[in-house]
């Protein structure tokens, strides 16, 4: 099964609408307050790092999915991402604690290098 590092590079602009119709930034470029590892109580620093205002995966480490502490029902997600050549990642949403892996309970917005990845576009 392909390895997916989910929630890849939650960068600069991520926001959700709360019940008071105010916008809430989930990542401010310097703090992971409000984020944690999937099925964890803390943030997985062994798999993620903050660098130059971006949240990045740590190369060579097993990917640990990150989620918000707060549960959202309606939201608008805006983000920027970078993906290495041949990369395969994604953004999961509406995840639950069901299953051992996040992809067992949540739909995914795929982030894939369609040109270079083996699962990408083909002639």
List the predicted regions and their residue ranges.
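Carbohydrate-interacting regions of secretory-pathway proteins
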Residues: 16-123
